[in-house]
């Protein structure tokens, strides 16, 4: 007898107005606006089931509670969840330091997975902190812990700083 399939419905806001606001605001005010509900959260958080908890200059803290839909074929949470949490926390730590009109993108990511994450792990906290901020490159690190402080993974990143971000323009249709 086949088991009934489980389902999960994911909803999100159009990300383009938020992306435009991110270009117009400094990184820290923009991230604080997300926390205050004044800007919508990015779709990746809605999809993966995590959210920012705190932001301050050079630091970002995310929270996630692993669920069945995070599982891989061998009965543990897929490493992609931890990797995405770590990348998000580090990227946002960098973003807190950037003025309006300046963005970033991850160019290198090194992740160390230390132990399996399961439903029994419970709530996870992921804290990213900036290590270095230059005019073209930033580096950051992050740690993924449970609520008792047990370390599940850590990472470092190198981000490219993107200056003079222009608002995204619609692409013309063929024949225009």
Regions found by a protein language model. Give the residues of each.
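Terminal targeting signals and extreme-terminal segments of soluble enzymes
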Residues: 1-176
């Amino acid at each position: 007898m086949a088991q009934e399939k489980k389902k999960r419905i994911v909803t999100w806001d159009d990300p383009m107005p938020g992306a435009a606001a991110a270009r117009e605001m400094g990184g820290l005010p923009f991230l604080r606006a997300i926390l205050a509900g004044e800007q919508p959260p990015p779709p990746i958080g809605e999809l993966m089931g995590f959210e920012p908890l705190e932001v301050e200059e050079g630091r970002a803290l995310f929270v996630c509670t692993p669920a069945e839909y995070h599982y891989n074929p061998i009965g543990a949470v897929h490493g992609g969840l931890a990797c995405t949490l770590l990348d998000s926390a580090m990227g946002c730590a960098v973003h807190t330091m950037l003025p309006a009109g300046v963005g970033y993108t991850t160019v290198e990511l090194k992740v160390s997975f230390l132990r399996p994450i399961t439903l029994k792990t419970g709530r996870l906290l992921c804290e990213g902190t900036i290590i270095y901020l230059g005019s073209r490159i930033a580096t950051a690190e992050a740690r993924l812990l449970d609520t008792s402080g047990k370390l599940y993974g850590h990472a470092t990143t190198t981000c490219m700083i993107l200056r003079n971000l222009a608002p995204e323009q619609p692409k013309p249709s063929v024949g225009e």
